[in-house]
């Protein structure tokens, strides 16, 4: 009789343990989903151009002010480069310019603004938004090579011209995420969050 009671108790304990484990797994998954929905999403990759980890194609260009610049390699030795695809009539690009400048200064990166359109449009844009150390290049070719379909779109290159991160950038968080992904070791912050949830689920098992 005592043996039967002990067996029943063990069965109940194991049942309670498994139920608790299943509940914890469900909670972890819900937290992950909530985190993805509530946290500012990182820059979204929407192009099909050169991949992260590949060396950037190189373009010998001249800035709108007539200064030669090589797009795809370090502007300053030892410093990363942020290629930001913009448009002179893009309101988000105009709002984002001081943010790009601030984040790049914090991260020690050179900024190359790459745009398309008429010279008149660019001159008007620059009258309203003067440059402050950024390189401004007018080129449809670079955007086509990277297959950028929407702006503002950022591509972060390391000091050797290797693509570290890229994605659509509509907010400060998006711009910052280009640099943050290199620190967390994932191509995008979405990928980092996804792997974090999966790793937590494995620990429960």
UniProtKB/Swiss-Prot annotation:
GO molecular function: antioxidant activity; oxidoreductase activity
Keywords of the record: Membrane, Transmembrane, Transmembrane helix
Compartment annotation: Membrane
Thioredoxin domain location: 50-184
SUPFAM superfamilies, per the entry: Thioredoxin-like (SSF52833)
GO cellular component, as recorded: membrane
Any one GO BP annotation for this protein: methylamine metabolic process
TM ranges: 5-25
Mode of membrane association: Single-pass membrane protein
Principal location listed in the UniProt entry: membrane
UniProt key word Transcription regulation: no
Pfam families: AhpC-TSA
Coiled-coil stretches noted in the UniProt entry, renumbered to this chain: none
S-S bridge residues: none
Domain of life: Bacteria
PROSITE patterns on file: THIOREDOXIN_2
InterPro entries hit by this protein: AhpC/TSA, MeN_DH_accessory, Thioredoxin-like_sf, Thioredoxin_domain
Pathway(s) of this molecule: One-carbon metabolism; methylamine degradation
Record function comment: May be specifically involved in the processing, transport, and/or maturation of the MADH beta-subunit.
NCBIfam families per UniProt: MauD (TIGR02661)
Stated name of the protein: Methylamine utilization protein MauD
């Amino acid at each position: 009789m005592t043996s039967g009671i002990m067996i029943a108790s063990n069965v109940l304990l194991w049942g309670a343990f498994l139920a608790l484990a299943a509940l914890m797994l469900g909670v972890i998954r819900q937290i992950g989903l909530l985190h993805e929905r509530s946290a500012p999403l990182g820059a979204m990759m929407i192009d099909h151009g050169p991949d992260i980890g590949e060396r950037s194609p190189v373009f010998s260009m001249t800035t709108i002010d007539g200064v030669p610049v090589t797009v795809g390699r370090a502007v300053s030795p030892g410093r990363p480069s942020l290629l930001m695809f913009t448009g002179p009539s893009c309101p988000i690009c105009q709002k984002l310019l001081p943010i790009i400048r601030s984040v790049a200064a914090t991260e020690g990166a050179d900024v190359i603004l790459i745009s398309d359109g008429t010279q008149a449009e660019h001159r008007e844009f620059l009258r309203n938004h003067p440059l402050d150390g950024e390189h401004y290049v007018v080129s449809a070719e670079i955007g086509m090579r990277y297959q950028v379909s929407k702006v503002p779109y950022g591509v972060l290159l390391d000091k050797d011209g290797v693509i570290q991160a890229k994605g659509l950038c509509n907010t400060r968080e998006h711009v910052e995420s280009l640099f943050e992904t290199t620190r967390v070791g994932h191509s995008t912050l979405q990928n980092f969050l996804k792997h974090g949830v999966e790793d937590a689920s494995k620990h429960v098992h």
